[in-house]
């Protein structure tokens, strides 16, 4: 039978209409959890992005996503608003009314008539005063001067959204009007100031959440930040938000409902995971670009290899890389190179390239699993006691224990550190001319390598980033301390772990930024390499034809057969090993060209005795003409490329990875770095990092994969 508050009084349905007596085929929710993991990770990321960009977040208690939390936290109230489900009002009111009725009947209930935690043996009939004291003693945070000890406003906004969502489910005993007030604060971009530290996320995030309650109740020590960054008093905050009726006098249980939840930890975890999912996909695509510029062998993505390993994250990572590399102009060129000279490089690529799917796959699985765990948490009812109107009772439990947050954040941080470790290994190969298959040391792009040290500083910075990231990978959750007179003797440290994971994400963005700019530099160096090699070949061929074809009397000369071997050497020699001074006798070009001519002369037999048929006699003339012509031709080719008129276009434009290159070079205007320019690497890295932090990299990243059908290429 339904009472006037919309609650079933003789069944097991609360005011929100949830019937827990109904039989279900999945009573333990393992099926729901498994179903949430179906489909590809990339499709899930695309869905996240689409949801992130919606202008309205509609809260009903059970459908909140990490994308919506990230949107509210990042967009500061501009372009996105929160709406509360009117259907939830009855359930919220029913639980609030139940608490008041219970209090009036003299029913003993934790946090309503009792003290808190280890001192819950104390009793009082002053329910409102008890809630007021709860907020007072929990306001134990330290802010100091400045904002160093204040929780970032984005994380506070996330916490506010998550807490509203929890309380909307009607099990907490709080008035709907309080939830509407918090919503107005969000929509008007008025953010309470919460302490950065001071919570162990069990019983919930008591200390930081008490400052939201402090603002709602008008505590004089409460502060908020307005839309323009101005510090507001509670009175100013209420006025600006349009909250009418003055400060709230908390009714029994309402203070506890506001503070006894995991919203701060899970809110920040949601923000972190939104970015972690994007960065995981970026790592997959950048690994494929790394294979392109390193002239890697694409067979490392072959589906059979990964099918036999069985791990879905690995299979998807390999399929994504395979898609990027399929038809790549770099892969085609590399295949020709390997066929021409199979001994020029090792039979197998190094682990950072060849095992990148095996390395990234488990990290993606961990991040995806953590995402689902946090998504369940932000839709959970996590305070205590829970008000079960249907059974006319308050249930004392421990849903405030934020273990899912602490564990998922520890695991996510470990995955982020592993992604960073791979990125560092790849970057280290990229800048090292002993490993990078012909690219210049440090990716130096200028004419004079003695005055151009390219990405050397960036490599040092990457080592620093990676070291700090590996340190952060250490778990937080094994540092639990017994708290609150040994009542809270195990606790989750959820927010601490979320904060450390947020730091890890920032560092991974620094590494991703540096690596992406390095990859773009390598792409342009391959373009330069191709143009310069073509110029050298054409010049050597031209001089060979002019000098080596004919004898002094116009007859065909034996040296005419040298040209093919001369050009074969030019093909095989790394261009950046000599191009800064191509005709230097100490560099390999002139040495190998002379060696080739000498070898032909030694095979020329008795012809060498005749001045008219001697190949030895041609060497000096050949070298002199080459010295006169080649430096000019090389400089001309460089100048043409720098002016945007290269003889050979950039292969990247034919590749699926082009959108990321285009984003860096054209949309952000990041320069090709050389020692000849004034611009430092850090100035350019900053632009990419800022854009990445704003989410501007998402569209070009997804554009690289827009034609992927979600499956690996068939095994033929």
From Swiss-Prot:
<feature type="active site" description="Proton donor/acceptor">
    <location>
        <position position="110"/>
    </location>
</feature>
<feature type="binding site">
    <location>
        <position position="487"/>
    </location>
    <ligand>
        <name>(E)-cinnamate</name>
    </ligand>
</feature>
<dbReference type="GO" id="GO:0032991">
    <property type="term" value="C:protein-containing complex"/>
</dbReference>
<keyword id="KW-0585">Phenylalanine catabolism</keyword>
<keyword id="KW-0963">Cytoplasm</keyword>
<dbReference type="GO" id="GO:0005737">
    <property type="term" value="C:cytoplasm"/>
</dbReference>
<dbReference type="GO" id="GO:0045548">
    <property type="term" value="F:phenylalanine ammonia-lyase activity"/>
</dbReference>
<feature type="binding site">
    <location>
        <position position="348"/>
    </location>
    <ligand>
        <name>(E)-cinnamate</name>
    </ligand>
</feature>
<protein>
    <recommendedName>
        <fullName>Phenylalanine ammonia-lyase 2</fullName>
        <ecNumber>4.3.1.24</ecNumber>
    </recommendedName>
</protein>
<dbReference type="InterPro" id="IPR005922">
    <property type="entry name" value="Phe_NH3-lyase"/>
</dbReference>
<comment type="pathway">
    <text>Phenylpropanoid metabolism; trans-cinnamate biosynthesis; trans-cinnamate from L-phenylalanine: step 1/1.</text>
</comment>
<dbReference type="InterPro" id="IPR008948">
    <property type="entry name" value="L-Aspartase-like"/>
</dbReference>
<feature type="binding site">
    <location>
        <position position="354"/>
    </location>
    <ligand>
        <name>(E)-cinnamate</name>
    </ligand>
</feature>
<feature type="binding site">
    <location>
        <position position="384"/>
    </location>
    <ligand>
        <name>(E)-cinnamate</name>
    </ligand>
</feature>
<keyword id="KW-0456">Lyase</keyword>
<feature type="cross-link" description="5-imidazolinone (Ala-Gly)">
    <location>
        <begin position="202"/>
        <end position="204"/>
    </location>
</feature>
<dbReference type="InterPro" id="IPR001106">
    <property type="entry name" value="Aromatic_Lyase"/>
</dbReference>
<feature type="binding site">
    <location>
        <position position="484"/>
    </location>
    <ligand>
        <name>(E)-cinnamate</name>
    </ligand>
</feature>
<comment type="similarity">
    <text>Belongs to the PAL/histidase family.</text>
</comment>
<feature type="modified residue" description="2,3-didehydroalanine (Ser)">
    <location>
        <position position="203"/>
    </location>
</feature>
<dbReference type="GO" id="GO:0009800">
    <property type="term" value="P:cinnamic acid biosynthetic process"/>
</dbReference>
<feature type="binding site">
    <location>
        <position position="456"/>
    </location>
    <ligand>
        <name>(E)-cinnamate</name>
    </ligand>
</feature>
<keyword id="KW-0587">Phenylpropanoid metabolism</keyword>
<feature type="binding site">
    <location>
        <position position="260"/>
    </location>
    <ligand>
        <name>(E)-cinnamate</name>
    </ligand>
</feature>
<dbReference type="GO" id="GO:0006559">
    <property type="term" value="P:L-phenylalanine catabolic process"/>
</dbReference>
<comment type="function">
    <text>This is a key enzyme of plant metabolism catalyzing the first reaction in the biosynthesis from L-phenylalanine of a wide variety of natural products based on the phenylpropane skeleton.</text>
</comment>
<dbReference type="InterPro" id="IPR023144">
    <property type="entry name" value="Phe_NH3-lyase_shielding_dom_sf"/>
</dbReference>
<dbReference type="Pfam" id="PF00221">
    <property type="entry name" value="Lyase_aromatic"/>
</dbReference>
<comment type="subunit">
    <text>Homotetramer.</text>
</comment>
<dbReference type="InterPro" id="IPR024083">
    <property type="entry name" value="Fumarase/histidase_N"/>
</dbReference>
<dbReference type="InterPro" id="IPR022313">
    <property type="entry name" value="Phe/His_NH3-lyase_AS"/>
</dbReference>
């Amino acid at each position: 039978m339904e009472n006037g508050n919309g609650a079933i009084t003789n069944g097991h349905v609360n005011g929100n209409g949830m019937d827990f007596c109904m039989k279900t085929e999945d009573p333990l929710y393992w099926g729901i959890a498994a179903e949430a993991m179906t489909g590809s990770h990339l499709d899930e990321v695309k869905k996240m992005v689409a949801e992130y960009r919606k202008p309205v977040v509609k809260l009903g208690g059970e459908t909140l996503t990490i994308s919506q939390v990230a949107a509210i936290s990042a967009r500061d109230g501009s372009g996105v608003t929160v709406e509360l489900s009117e259907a939830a009002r009855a359930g919220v009111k029913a639980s609030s009314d139940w608490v008041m009725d219970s209090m009036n009947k003299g029913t003993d209930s934790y946090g309503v008539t009792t003290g808190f935690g280890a001192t819950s043996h104390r009793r009082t009939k002053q329910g409102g005063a008890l809630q007021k004291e709860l907020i007072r003693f929990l306001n134990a945070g330290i802010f100091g001067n400045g904002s160093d000890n204040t929780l970032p406003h984005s994380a506070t906004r996330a916490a506010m959204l998550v807490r509203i969502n929890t309380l909307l489910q009607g099990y907490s005993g709080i008035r709907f009007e309080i939830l509407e007030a918090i919503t107005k604060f969000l929509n008007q971009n008025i953010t309470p100031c919460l302490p950065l530290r001071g919570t162990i996320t069990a019983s919930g995030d008591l200390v930081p959440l008490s400052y939201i309650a402090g603002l709602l109740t008008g505590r004089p020590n409460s502060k908020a930040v307005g839309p323009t960054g101005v510090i507001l008093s509670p009175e100013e905050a209420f006025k600006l938000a349009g909250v009418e009726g003055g400060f709230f006098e908390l009714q029994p249980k309402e203070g506890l409902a506001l503070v006894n939840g995991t919203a701060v930890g899970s809110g920040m975890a949601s923000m972190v995971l939104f970015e972690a999912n994007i960065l995981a996909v970026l790592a997959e695509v950048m690994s494929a670009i790394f294979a392109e510029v390193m002239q890697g062998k694409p067979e490392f993505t072959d589906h059979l290899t990964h099918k036999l390993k069985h791990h879905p994250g690995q299979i998807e990572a390999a399929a994504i890389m395979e898609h990027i590399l399929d038809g790549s102009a770099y892969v085609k060129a590399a295949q020709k190179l390997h066929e021409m000279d199979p001994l020029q490089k090792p039979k197998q690529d190094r682990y950072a390239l060849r095992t990148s799917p095996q390395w990234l796959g488990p990290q993606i699985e961990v991040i995806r699993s953590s995402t689902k765990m946090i998504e369940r948490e932000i839709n959970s009812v996590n305070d205590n006691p829970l008000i079960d109107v249907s059974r006319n009772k308050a249930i004392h439990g421990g849903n405030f224990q934020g273990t899912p947050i602490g564990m998922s954040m520890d695991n996510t941080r470990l995955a982020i550190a592993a992604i960073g470790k791979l990125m560092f290994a790849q970057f280290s190969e990229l800048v090292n001319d002993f490993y990078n298959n012909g690219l210049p040391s440090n990716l130096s792009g200028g004419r004079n390598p003695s005055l151009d040290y390219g990405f050397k500083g960036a490599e040092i910075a990457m080592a620093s980033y990676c070291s700090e990231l590996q340190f952060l990978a250490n778990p937080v959750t094994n540092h639990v301390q017994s708290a609150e007179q040994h009542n809270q003797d195990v606790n989750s440290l959820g927010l601490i772990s979320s904060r450390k994971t947020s730091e890890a994400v920032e560092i991974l963005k620094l590494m991703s930024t540096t690596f992406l700019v390095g990859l773009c530099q390598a792409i342009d160096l391959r373009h330069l390499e191709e143009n310069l090699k073509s110029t050298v070949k054409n010049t050597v061929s031209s001089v060979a034809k002019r000098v080596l074809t004919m004898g002094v009397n116009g007859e065909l000369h034996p040296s005419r057969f040298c040209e093919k071997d001369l050009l074969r050497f030019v093909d095989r020699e790394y261009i950046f090993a000599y191009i800064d001074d191509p005709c230097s006798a100490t560099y390999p070009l002139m040495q190998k060209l002379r060696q080739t001519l000498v070898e032909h002369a030694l095979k020329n037999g008795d012809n060498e005795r005749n001045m008219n048929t001697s190949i030895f006699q041609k060497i000096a003339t050949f070298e002199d003409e080459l010295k006169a012509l080649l430096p000019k031709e090389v400089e001309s080719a460089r100048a043409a490329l720098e002016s945007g008129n290269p003889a050979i276009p950039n292969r990247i434009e034919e590749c699926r990875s082009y959108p990321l290159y285009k984003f860096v070079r054209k949309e952000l205007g990041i320069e090709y770095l050389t020692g000849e320019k004034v611009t430092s690497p850090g100035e350019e890295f900053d632009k990419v990092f800022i854009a990445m932090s704003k989410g501007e990299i998402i569209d070009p990243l997804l554009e690289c994969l827009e034609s992927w059908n979600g499956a690996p290429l068939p095994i033929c």
